């Protein structure tokens, strides 16, 4: 039986996780699961889930675990890259159980590290270019605060399991991508 494979991308909003996860998925034949993209799609389409999560996302808060896990289970593939999930220890533990149940091997957890002021600059520039109304400076700072509070504990969790790969997120996308491939050994 073929065992599934997974890579998790961690890092604050604006670190370039999505860009790098997309490239890795495309070049290596993985399916990229971006919970943010999936949720924004539901909001845009006005689905029942979208209506439930719209006010949560507008506040810059995290969407509840049960809703996220429901999405993940529906979207799981044999070779998958998680972008923006897990975001909490509870989600990480739930994902561990799900990967175990499905026989999916975790190849590594890539932590893309970028200084905070650079993150704010990147996110505000992206919001301007893409017309993303959920990204204004107040919301960006709130998202970074939520990240520090909820997601940074995952660094220790995955470090203790020996699967964390720290990658400098500064430089050109090609430079960062090369660091990620080297860190994962692929």
From Swiss-Prot:
Q: Pathway involvement?
A: Purine metabolism; AMP biosynthesis via salvage pathway; AMP from ADP: step 1/1
UniProt-annotated binding residues for AMP: 35, 40, 61-63, 84-87, 91, 132, 143
Q: Does the keyword Phosphoprotein apply?
A: no
* Catalyzed reactions: AMP + ATP = 2 ADP
Endoplasmic reticulum as a keyword of this entry, yes or no, is no
Q: Which SUPFAM superfamilies match?
A: P-loop containing nucleoside triphosphate hydrolases (SSF52540)
Annotated EC: 2.7.4.3
Q: Which GO terms describe its molecular function?
A: adenylate kinase activity; ATP binding
Q: Where is this region: NMP?
A: 34-63
Offer a single GO CC term for the protein: cytoplasm
Record keywords, A-Z: ATP-binding, Cytoplasm, Kinase, Nucleotide biosynthesis, Nucleotide-binding, Transferase
Q: Name one GO biological process term.
A: AMP salvage
The entry's ATP-binding residues are: 14-19, 126, 171
What Pfam families does the database record attribute to this sequence?
ADK
Compartments where located: Cytoplasm
Q: Organism's domain of life? A: Bacteria
Provide the residue span(s) of the region labelled LID: 125-135
**Assembly description:** Monomer.
Q: What function does the entry list?
A: Catalyzes the reversible transfer of the terminal phosphate group between ATP and AMP. Plays an important role in cellular energy homeostasis and in adenine nucleotide metabolism.
What is the similarity comment for this entry?
Belongs to the adenylate kinase family.
Q: What is known of its domains?
A: Consists of three domains, a large central CORE domain and two small peripheral domains, NMPbind and LID, which undergo movements during catalysis. The LID domain closes over the site of phosphoryl transfer upon ATP binding. Assembling and dissambling the active center during each catalytic cycle provides an effective means to prevent ATP hydrolysis.
NCBIfam families with a match to the protein in the record: PRK00279.1-3, PRK14527.1, PRK14531.1, PRK14532.1
Specify the protein name: Adenylate kinase
Give the organism the record lists: Thermus thermophilus (strain ATCC 27634 / DSM 579 / HB8)
């Amino acid at each position: 039986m073929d065992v599934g494979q997974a890579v998790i991308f961690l890092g604050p909003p604006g670190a370039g996780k999505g860009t790098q996860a997309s490239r890795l998925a495309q070049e290596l034949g993985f399916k990229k699961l971006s919970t943010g993209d999936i949720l924004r799609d539901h909001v845009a389409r006005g689905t029942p889930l979208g209506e439930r999560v719209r006010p949560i996302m507008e506040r810059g808060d995290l969407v509840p675990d049960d809703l996220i896990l429901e999405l993940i289970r529906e979207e799981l593939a044999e070779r998958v890259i998680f972008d923006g999930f897990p975001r909490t220890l509870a989600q990480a533990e739930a994902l561990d159980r799900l990967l175990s149940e499905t026989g999916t091997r975790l190849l590594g957890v890539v932590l893309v590290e970028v200084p905070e002021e650079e993150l704010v600059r990147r996110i505000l520039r992206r919001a301007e270019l893409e017309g993303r109304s959920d990204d204004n400076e107040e919301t960006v700072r709130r998202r970074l605060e939520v990240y520090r509070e909820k997601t940074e504990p995952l660094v220790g969790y995955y470090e203790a399991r020996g699967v964390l790969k720290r990658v400098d997120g500064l430089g050109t996308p090609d430079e960062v991508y090369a660091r990620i491939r080297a860190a994962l050994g692929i």
